[in-house]
């Protein structure tokens, strides 16, 4: 994997930093694992904007990823690594011994030809998926379930991982990258190793158009709006907003806690680190 800093041959190239992975498949994705993905433009069924800064962008197919890893006892071989426009991580196309193909997240160090497996009898090695009760304390894992059988929800982005720090009774304690310590049932599955493509964070798009290709629209400052559009809007001439920063709906935007899921508070042993 190479990091390329473009020469300033134009204003649009001056700040571009690319991450080039020569191991990725250059052809089309596996057609049997593609699904239609339609654009919403950030609108809901009534046509109102519910998510700002969304719209446009290149057409995409959704890749159906196996986040459950429940084909126990059937060995599989990694056929190739592929780019996925729907996530920061790369994905791997695996061929099981029974002839079925599936996409999974590509772990760090995974290559074409690697053998992987899932289940309680799987070996402790990168790419294998096991229940947390069978994973040694201190191990680094990714794609962790929060409920048994629901599918992976934690540590799915490029370069992320979770460490198993303890196991007590029916719960395992995990340390997340944010610093949060969280309890998860030991029957939840996780995949050994880190998510690959950690260099993703080093890339620089370099120009506004590269954001538009990805379906991201501009962000307008509140102080540049009218009073009807934002609490910071209006005023004669340039203003600083006149109050502590808030969202367009008046919610404080710097350091204000908005978590309200009391049902799962008991599973959080320690809150995440302050930025």
Swiss-Prot record:
SMART domains: Ribosomal_L2, Ribosomal_L2_C. Pfam families: Ribosomal_L2, Ribosomal_L2_C. Keywords: Ribonucleoprotein, Ribosomal protein, RNA-binding, rRNA-binding. InterPro entries: NA-bd_OB-fold, Rib_uL2_dom2, Ribosomal_uL2, Ribosomal_uL2_bac/org-type, Ribosomal_uL2_C, Ribosomal_uL2_CS, Ribosomal_uL2_dom3, Ribosomal_uL2_RNA-bd_dom. GO terms for cellular component: large ribosomal subunit. Residues 223-275 are annotated as: Disordered. One of its GO terms (molecular function) is rRNA binding. GO terms for biological process: cytoplasmic translation. HAMAP family: Ribosomal_uL2_B. Belongs to the universal ribosomal protein uL2 family. One of the primary rRNA binding proteins. Required for association of the 30S and 50S subunits to form the 70S ribosome, for tRNA binding and peptide bond formation. It has been suggested to have peptidyltransferase activity; this is somewhat controversial. Makes several contacts with the 16S rRNA in the 70S ribosome. Part of the 50S ribosomal subunit. Forms a bridge to the 30S subunit in the 70S ribosome. This is Large ribosomal subunit protein uL2. It comes from Shewanella woodyi (strain ATCC 51908 / MS32). The lineage of its organism: Bacteria, Pseudomonadati, Pseudomonadota, Gammaproteobacteria, Alteromonadales.
């Amino acid at each position: 994997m190479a990091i390329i800093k473009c020469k300033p041959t134009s204003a649009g190239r001056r700040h571009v930093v690319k991450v080039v992975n020569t191991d990725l498949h250059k052809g089309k994705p596996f057609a049997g694992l593609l699904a239609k993905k339609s654009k919403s433009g950030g609108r809901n069924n009534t046509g109102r904007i519910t998510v700002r800064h969304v719209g446009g962008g290149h057409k995409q197919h959704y890749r159906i990823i196996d986040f459950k890893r429940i084909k126990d006892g059937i060995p599989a071989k990694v056929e190739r690594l592929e780019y996925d426009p729907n996530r920061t991580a790369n994905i791997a196309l695996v061929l099981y011994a029974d002839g079925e193909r599936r996409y999974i997240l590509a772990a760090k160090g995974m290559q074409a030809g690697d053998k992987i497996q899932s289940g309680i009898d799987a070996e402790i090695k990168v790419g294998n998926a096991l229940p947390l009760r069978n994973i040694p304390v201190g191990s680094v894992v990714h794609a962790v379930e929060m409920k048994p059988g629901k599918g992976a929800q934690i540590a799915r982005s490029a370069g992320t991982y979770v460490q198993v720090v303890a196991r007590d009774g029916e719960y395992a304690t995990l340390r997340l990258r944010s610093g949060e310590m969280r309890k998860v049932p030991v029957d939840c599955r996780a995949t050994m190793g880190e998510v690959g493509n950690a260099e993703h964070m080093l890339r620089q798009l370099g120009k506004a158009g590269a954001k538009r290709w990805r379906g991201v629209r501009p962000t307008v400052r509140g102080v540049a709006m009218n009073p009807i559009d934002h609490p910071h809007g209006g005023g004669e001439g340039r203003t600083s907003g006149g109050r502590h920063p808030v969202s367009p709906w008046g919610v404080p935007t710097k350091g204000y806690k908005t978590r309200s899921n009391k049902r799962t508070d008991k599973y959080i042993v320690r809150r995440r680190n302050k930025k």
